[in-house]
């Protein structure tokens, strides 16, 4: 797999289909109990990734969340740091900062991510969320916010705050690096 994907990070972020295809190309062994042509290795790697994400999410539950804490940053890296396509996550919190839920959106394109404002506002009201955090990744490797990121954040902040929902931060993840637009003075 390393020969095919080039690194453990790339293996970790690959889909089960891509993993199984790579295994088939190098004569990997299938899982006889998985059915005709079934592969268990790709599914097991993806399941392990989901388990690691759930364990990181668990650290957010039950306590007020601060975007500067190592636990929160670890969670964002787990969810977004290795993805090859730009994705956006909206995290919903109570007024006291307790984690309620998250929504995950993928644009499937590099260099562009759209924050779904209508869906975000509707979901915030459905959850009775009082605070939001936006996070998205830059597969390019630079966590620095673009001009488009700054403009989208300002637009979102104006919309949600007019509806009495706070936008606490917009974090950008690139690999293991995270930039907080709030900490950078961009919000």
Labelled PLM ranges:
Residues 1-61:
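Long amphipathic alpha-helical segments
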Residues 56-106, 182-187:
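Non-catalytic interface/targeting segments
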Residues 20-23, 64-68, 123-126:
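Short, intrinsically disordered/low-complexity patches at protein termini
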Residues 9, 17, 39-40, 67-74, ...:
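Generic alpha-helical secondary structure signal
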Residues 37-44, 74, 78, 92, ...:
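Active-site-proximal loop/helix of nucleotide/amide-processing enzymes and allied scaffolds
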Residues 31-34, 87, 171:
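Generic recognition of cysteine residues
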